[in-house]
Design a protein with these regions (language model features):
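Conserved metal-phosphate-binding beta-hairpin within the catalytic cores
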Residues: 38-64, 278, 325, 337-346, ...
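Conserved N-proximal alpha/beta basic substrate-recognition cap immediately N-terminal to
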Residues: 77-81, 104-271
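Phosphate-binding site of ATP-dependent enzymes
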Residues: 54, 252-262, 267-274, 281-288, ...
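Short Pro/Gly-enriched beta-strand edge/turn motifs at strand-loop
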Residues: 26-36, 318-326
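Conserved hydrophobic helix-helix packing surfaces used for dimerization/oligomerization
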Residues: 95-98, 168, 275
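Low-complexity, highly charged intrinsically disordered N-terminal segments
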Residues: 1-28, 38, 44-45, 51, ...
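Short, flexible loop/turn elements at secondary-structure junctions
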Residues: 47-52, 62-64, 102, 154-156, ...
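Conserved catalytic alpha/beta cores of large enzymes that bind or transform nucleotide phosphates
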Residues: 86-103, 368-427
Length: 444
């Protein structure tokens, strides 16, 4: 059963909530059967938007970087989920190498690494941190704002008698491409596989897989799949600086706006449809633009064109996703908020609200100035099937967990289809086997 998260929020009645609660036994059995056919990624986070009339994922991250924003109350469940994930991949695992992002000066991100390391250690693993950062030439202690510290070590293909990791866990999304040290490897499990990195992965492929999952799930609970699935399309060969692909992009935006407007009329929704144009690869809230009218794309200023042309690690944008905008009508202390749900293996382990005091309900909240409000578990709570719809927080967050798991299942399908090692028998999906003992350069 998905854990239930505490929140002081209340919202409009969702028909979806009622139908999901009524179908809870069927839904849980459906997920159980799906996980017999598909293997979930080792971990994942999903950004959700709740407009009151629609609840949908807008981003799925296969290298989640906010474990430090989760409530400490979720740690026991996270540890259990990590144990289950590791047991499936490498039951005899003793050592694990964790590879974070290059940026060693972002202490907020490093607090995420500290929390993730703690979870893995409590799951029974000896964890060491290896980095690609050129700044780290030798084992280096990094002090964190909360008083903890991390030992970061340079990576090298060097066998150590006291550290032979069974698995290597990436918390680096490979936006800059595959480092040479990770190429042509065998024998150890690399989680997730290299094909999960942004040098290969595309959001449009994920949402195509999600559309399949949403349609299948909608039949199970008898709902319109649009209630949980944002319309989308994609454009290739776009160059914002040179204004290449501009007409095709405008046409795509217009198509999504028209489809969304038709649904709004069908359900009597008075809000104005909008779309979000975002880089088809990349993360960190970069390369994102809200569009209410296709004509806006003709009048982009230099600042907007620069913003849309390059994302993390200087990755140039040529492919874009055009996604139906989903309003968020949730608030924390009167500030606009959106839930982010975290999972390890197939289990929801917690979540938090991303909050932005200077943004509106139709804007991207993953931007400078955001802050996070952890969601804690409500003790001894299960969905209250007799409660008035929309009135019980456990019911609302059970629903969030269901939709997040649909996105997780979509990620499974997405990675299966892009896995270059799919034909290799005996290899757990989404794990790449690597050779040579791959560990940090110097023993601790």
């Amino acid at each position: 059963m998905v854990p239930h998260l505490i929140t002081a929020l209340s919202g409009p009645l969702l028909e979806l909530e009622s139908k999901v609660l009524e179908a809870t036994p069927t839904i849980e059995r459906w997920f159980r059967l799906e996980w017999q056919e598909h293997t979930p990624p080792f971990y994942c986070s999903v950004d959700l938007r709740n407009s009151g009339f629609k609840l949908a994922p807008v981003d799925t991250n296969l290298f989640p970087g906010g474990f430090n924003n989760l409530s400490p109350q979720m740690l026991p469940l996270a540890v259990q989920a990590a144990m289950a994930a590791i047991e499936k991949i490498c039951p005899e695992a003793k050592n694990l190498l964790l590879i974070p992002e290059r940026h060693t000066r972002n202490t907020f991100y490093l607090q995420n690494i500290a929390r993730l390391s703690s979870i893995l250690r409590q799951a029974g693993l000896n964890v060491r941190l290896g980095t690609f950062s050129e700044e780290i030439k030798k084992p280096t202690w990094i002090e964190l704002p909360d008083g903890n510290r991390l030992l970061m070590e340079p990576l090298s293909r060097l066998g150590l008698k006291d550290f032979d990791p069974c698995s290597i866990l990436l918390n680096n999304d490979l936006s800059a491409g595959i480092p040479p040290i990770l190429e042509n490897l065998h024998e150890q499990y690399l989680l997730p596989g290299l094909h999960a990195g942004w040098h290969i992965r595309r959001k449009s492929n994920h949402f195509a897989a999600y559309e399949e999952v949403a349609k299948k799930f909608a039949k199970v609970v008898d709902i319109d799949p649009w209630m949980i699935n944002p319309y989308f399309t994609s454009c290739s060969n776009v160059n914002f600086h040179e204004r290449k692909g501009e007409e095709e992009l405008q046409t795509s935006v217009e198509q999504i706006l028209k489809k969304t407007a038709k649904k709004y009329r069908e359900y009597g929704i008075k809000d104005k449809p909008y779309v979000v144009v975002k880089a088809d690869a990349g993360t960190y809230g970069m390369g994102i633009m809200v569009v209410n009218d296709p004509s806006q794309l003709k009048d982009l200023n230099r600042k907007d064109r620069n913003k849309m042309s390059v994302v993390k690690e200087g990755l140039a944008v040529s492919d874009v996703l055009i996604q139906e905008g989903v309003y968020t009508f949730e608030k924390v202390n009167e500030a606009v908020a959106e839930p982010v749900v975290y999972m390890i293996d197939r289990y929801v382990i917690g979540g938090f609200y991303r909050v932005h005091t200077d943004r509106g309900p139709d804007e991207n909240l993953n931007a400078p100035g955001m802050h996070f409000v952890p969601l804690a578990f409500e003790q001894n709570s299960i969905p209250d099937l007799g409660a008035k719809p929309g009135s019980a927080p456990p019911n609302r967050f059970y629903l969030y967990g269901v939709v997040a798991r649909l996105a997780l299942l979509a990620a499974s399908l997405e990675l299966e289809r892009s896995d270059p090692n799919a034909e290799v028998t005996g290899v757990p999906p989404f794990a790449v086997i690597v050779s040579n003992v791959f560990c940090c350069e110097v023993s601790v």
